[in-house]
Structure formats: C-alpha cells, structure tokens
C-alpha cells in the first residue's frame, strides 16, 4: 500500500468532542483579498489543509510577507508584490494546482492593472465555467487574452476599473467574490445582481468593509459597492467550516456514535441541520454545540403525501452541493429511500459504484440523480479497495469505510487532504 492511501478498519463506534476548522471556501477568498491593501491583515481560524497551504505558498511567491502567529493565525502584508513571478514556470505550476487561484485576478487587477491566470485546478466534478468571472471583470473594464504557448490568461485594465451594473449569468460564489474584490477599488458605483450570498461571500464583504470598503446589501443577491481609493489592514476571524460540520454529522450517524461538535456557529448553517433531520438523524443543540446522540437506526422522512423524499442542492440559502455526497452515503444505512438530485454538478455522483461494491443499494438514474434504497442496518457495508475521486466523495467514502465491516483501502487521499 502506498503512502497516498488510508487503511481503514471499520465497524467501530466513535465518541467525544470535535471542533471544526475554519471554512475552506472562505479562507481562499479572504487570503486573496489581503492583496487589496499594503497594510498587514491578520486572519485567524485559518484551516490547515492542502488547498490553503498551496495558496499561502503562491502568495509568498508573489512577494507577500506571510507570518504565522499561531497554528491557525497568520498575518499577511502585500506591500511589495513581485509581478515578475507571473512569468515563471513556478507560478504556472502552482496556480494551476488550485482552483482558488482564479480569485487572485481581481485584487491584482484592481491594484496593478494586470494579472495572469493559468488554467486552474480543483475537483474533477464536471464542467465548472470561468465565464462568470471573465464577463463580470470585463464589464468593469478588464481585457482578457489567452496565451496559448503558456496556457494562461493575461488580464489587463489599461483604463482602470469602472463601476457598472452587473447581472451575473449564474450564481457563482467565486465569481461573485472576484467581482466584489475588483469593484471595491473601481471608480464609481457597481451593482451586482444575482450575486451569491453564501456565508463565505458575506464574510468576505464584512472583512472588506472593515478594511474601508463601502458595500451595501450584504447577505442579499443585490450588492451595491461604492469604489474607494484604498483599503487598510484589519483582523478577521473565519467561520467554522459548515461542510466539515455536515461531514461530522454524517460520520456520527453512520458509525452509531455519540459525538459533540463544538463551536459550530449554528446561526450560520442555514438549512443544513434540517436536511439531516429529514434523513432521520437526531440533533441536540446545546448553545453553539451540536450533539449527535448514538442511534441504532434512523428513518428517512417522506413528503406529506407519502412520496419519496428528494434531497437536492441549490445556491444559498438552499442546500449546499458540497454535502450531497455525505447525504448519499448516510442514506445507504437508513430506513427508507431517498432521491439524491445533484443539480449543480454533473459528475459528483460517479463514486456510487464504489458504494455499490461495498453492498449499498443505489440506482444511478443519470449523471445528476441517484435513488438510494436504505439497508436499515440489516446488511452492514463491507470493506473494499477504492480511490477518492474528489474532496467530498473522498470523505463520503471514508465515512462509508469507517462504518463498514472489515478493512478498506482508500487511494488518492490527497484529494481529501485538500479540504479536510
């Protein structure tokens, strides 16, 4: 077995308390936003995960001073950016390994009038367009050129960025973040309609306001931004990762464990707790903690007319697509059936063959839909050898392995390390 694999001996209950790390999706945004000022910015509750560490390395390469204050607190100062780093093979290699690098465009464009972007990496979960980023920035005055020999985009704003009205063609979290970061230093007023309003975007906007930006409508799908000349430094604490919290809930349910999730910021979880309760999972709320008591069985609810429950993803405040894989795997041991409808990505259900090999009863209807017939714990999943295709499916398979009888081996675990 290689070192890029987990060997899991499952079927054992877990117990105790666990505290989630800071939110990965927020971390990538606020790290890029530190480029908008020459002053120091201190970020706390920053998660120690592969994607964040790669972005920190990328910022160091750009000349950002990065000082680690504590295990999860960093001070960053972007007062001496090395634009020549864009021309190096190291930049193209490192930036292409992480999809979050796309959010470097806006702050560099806003401060220096130029930026570069190799084709970004990330999960292989279907088509993920960059059009929303490009069109939004183009309307603010950016010009994009593709350099085929380097496989990268060159972005310039020869006349500077100017505020305008933007109707986003899709609700994109990173697309909204990019446009917001460009607009805060653009001349004039920018209105962004159909903006993403996930807690990650709200947190980014609140941090920018602390830095001196003028943003109205935070938490809604209509943002109004009055450009300013410069931003100052600030201190910002990241929210706990709602995806990690949901993963822990699924882990507790599948392994019949009694687990308490500490400091979960329940007010920021939206409908996530309700969705798990619809799957029959009992949750006890104790202040800002969530206790998942040990359950021998859990039963999926039906709709009022008795029809099969459907769980589907949607932009916030809908159910996050990043927890659909977790929902699918916990359904395998529930009483009852559920239709899992992954609307936003077309390849995230392609790990179900591994669950079927473990003994799950799943019908893959098409790339977006799967029906799960729960085993009701009558037949325990069995351990197998498998590979992690992406972050969220990887954790779902890890949860399945922890609940399964016997030994499982999960390869390609760097995918899990990217987000956990």
Where are the regions a protein language model picked out?
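Short, structured segments at the rim of ligand-binding sites
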Residues: 1-420
């Amino acid at each position: 077995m290689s070192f890029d694999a987990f060997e899991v001996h499952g079927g054992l209950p877990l117990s105790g308390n666990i505290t989630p790390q800071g939110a990965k999706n927020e971390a990538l945004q606020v790290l890029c936003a530190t480029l908008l000022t020459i002053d120091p910015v201190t970020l706390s509750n920053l998660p120690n995960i592969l994607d964040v560490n790669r972005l920190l390395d990328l910022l160091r390469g750009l000349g950002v001073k990065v000082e680690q204050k504590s295990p999860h607190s960093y001070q960053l100062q972007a007062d001496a950016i090395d634009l020549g780093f864009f021309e190096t093979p190291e930049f193209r290699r490192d930036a292409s390994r992480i999809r979050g690098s796309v959010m470097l465009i806006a702050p560099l464009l806003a401060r220096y009038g130029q930026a570069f972007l190799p084709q970004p990496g990330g999960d292989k979960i279907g088509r993920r367009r960059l059009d929303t980023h490009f069109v939004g920035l183009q309307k603010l005055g950016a010009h994009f050129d593709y350099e085929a020999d380097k496989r990268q985009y060159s972005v310039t704003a020869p006349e500077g960025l100017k505020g305008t009205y933007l109707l986003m063609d899709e609700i994109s979290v990173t697309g909204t973040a990019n446009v917001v970061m460009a607009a805060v230093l653009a001349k004039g007023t920018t209105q962004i309609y159909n903006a993403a309003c996930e807690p990650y975007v709200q947190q980014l906007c609140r941090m920018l306001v602390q830095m001196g930006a003028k943003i109205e409508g935070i938490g809604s799908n209509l943002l109004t931004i009055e450009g300013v000349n410069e931003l100052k430094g600030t201190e910002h604490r990241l929210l706990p990762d709602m995806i990690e919290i949901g993963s822990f809930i699924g882990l507790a349910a599948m392994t019949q464990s009694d687990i308490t999730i500490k400091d979960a910021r329940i007010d920021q979880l939206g409908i996530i707790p309700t969705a798990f309760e619809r799957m029959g999972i009992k949750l006890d709320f104790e202040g800002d903690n969530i206790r998942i008591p040990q359950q021998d069985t859990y039963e999926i609810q039906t709709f009022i007319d008795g029809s099969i429950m459907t769980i589907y993803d949607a932009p916030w405040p809908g159910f996050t697509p990043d927890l659909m894989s977790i929902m699918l795997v916990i359904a395998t041991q529930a009483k009852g059936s559920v239709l899992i409808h992954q609307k936003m990505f077309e390849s995230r259900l392609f790990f179900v063959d591994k669950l079927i090999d473990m003994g799950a009863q799943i019908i893959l209807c098409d790339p977006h839909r799967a029906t799960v017939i729960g085993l009701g714990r009558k037949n325990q999943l069995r351990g197998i050898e498998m590979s992690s295709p992406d972050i969220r499916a990887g954790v779902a398979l890890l949860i399945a392995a922890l609940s399964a009888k016997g030994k499982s081996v999960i390869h390609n675990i760097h995918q899990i390390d990217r987000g956990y």
